[in-house]
A protein has these predicted regions:
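Conserved active-site and cofactor/substrate-binding residues in soluble primary-metabolism enzymes
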Residues: 2, 41-45, 58-61, 75-85, ...
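Function-dense linear segments that define catalytic or interfacial modules
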Residues: 11-111, 121-127, 131, 198-225, ...
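Hydrophobic/aromatic-rich, well-ordered segments within soluble, folded domains that form packed cores
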Residues: 116-134, 305-318
Length: 345
């Protein structure tokens, strides 16, 4: 109990440590792991990787993401299959190059034996806002399930097809599959920006208006879906945007917006943390690895309530929790020191 109290205190102060639910990770592990008694002992720094490691094998991450903003364009195509094949090719190149590098034997052996890949997703909140669907809504939950069920079904068929064409790896002999795992949701911070300033991963926008400070330049972000609504209403003015900036990116003070529009453009701090957990639990059944799941907790939330939320996440089958965000300068500084550039990209 004392250790758990320290964990809760630290997460409230600096957003860490991350939480890894070993039991959920192994309950939701691929069937081949269960059949062969392979255990998942840990994750990566961004907490979305759920792969078995041993004295002989060290897991490697092979990840990429589908842009959910364009879901309607690719849902009935072979885009997921192509991405899976692309990641398989990345594994082949890794095996070829790393085989010649000293002390990489365990990583190469894992890649050869398991060929685990992780197709993720980015732009979830952008998709919802483009359709004027509030994050906290039954419609969002239904679309959430549809998307990840579609991706899972398509990647499973791709794995079967690839096994016939390219062969089964050692661990999957007799299973008719090419990849031990197919899905993992990474943070995708940089990728989301590169793809058109969309929302990152499965996370809500933190603000509708802000200045993004990049390595070589600063970029002013205005939510394009909000800008479209403001333009239609005749309020796409500097005065309106200045007021949004003063409200930390919120639009809840704008009287000319309807309640539905205000709900659509709620920011991460204005969306209940439990809703992000509910949606994560819904999609987890279609994800064989894990999700890099951040929680936004208001600074005045009691430790009892935070504890209850984490217990709820565990009971819902969530495998891990990444950062616990809050309006806290110390957290922002500490997170910057500990980001994983590979996953964040």
């Amino acid at each position: 109990r004392d250790v758990w109290a320290k964990v809760l205190k630290s997460r409230s102060e600096v957003g860490m440590p991350y939480i890894f639910f070993t039991d959920n990770a192994n309950k939701g592990a691929p069937q081949v792991y269960k059949d062969k008694g392979r255990k998942i002992h840990g994750s990566n720094v961004c907490s979305e990787i759920m792969l078995s490691s041993s004295e002989d094998e060290s897991f490697v991450c092979c990840l990429s993401s589908m842009n959910l903003l364009n879901y309607d364009r690719w849902k009935d195509t072979n885009a997921v299959e192509l991405l899976a094949y692309f990641l398989d090719a990345v594994l082949t190149e890794f095996i070829s190059k790393a085989s010649e590098i000293p002390f990489m034997e365990r990583a190469v052996r894992f890649a050869e034996n398991q060929r685990a890949i992780g197709i993720g997703a980015t732009g979830w909140h952008s998709l919802l806002q483009s359709k004027m669907i509030p994050f906290e809504s039954l419609e969002a939950q239904m679309l959430n399930c549809e998307i990840f069920e579609t991706m899972s079904n398509q990647s499973l068929e791709a794995s079967k097809k690839a096994a016939k064409e390219l062969g089964e790896p050692e661990m999957l002999k007799g299973y008719g599959l090419r990849w031990t795992t197919r899905h993992a949701i990474a943070p995708n911070t940089s990728s989301a920006f590169i793809l058109g300033q969309g929302s990152q991963s499965i996370e809500p926008f933190k603000s509708n208006y802000y200045v993004k400070d990049l390595a070589k330049f600063k970029y002013t972000f205005k939510n394009p879906y909000l800008e479209k609504v403001l333009e239609e209403k005749g309020f796409n003015t500097d005065e309106t945007w200045d007021s949004i900036l003063l409200k930390n990116g919120s639009v809840q003070h704008l009287s000319f917006l309807s309640q539905h529009e205000k709900d659509v453009f709620r920011t991460f701090t204005e969306i209940g943390a439990k809703e992000t957990v509910i949606q994560a639990a819904q999609r987890q059944k279609y994800i064989d690895q894990g999700q890099s799941l951040n929680l936004m907790i208001p600074p005045d939330t009691t430790t009892k309530d935070i504890n209850s939320l984490i217990i709820y996440a565990h009971a819902s089958g969530i495998k891990s929790l990444y950062y616990q965000h809050s309006v806290n300068a110390a957290q922002a500084f500490y997170r910057k020191l500990n980001e994983c550039s590979s996953c964040e990209g």
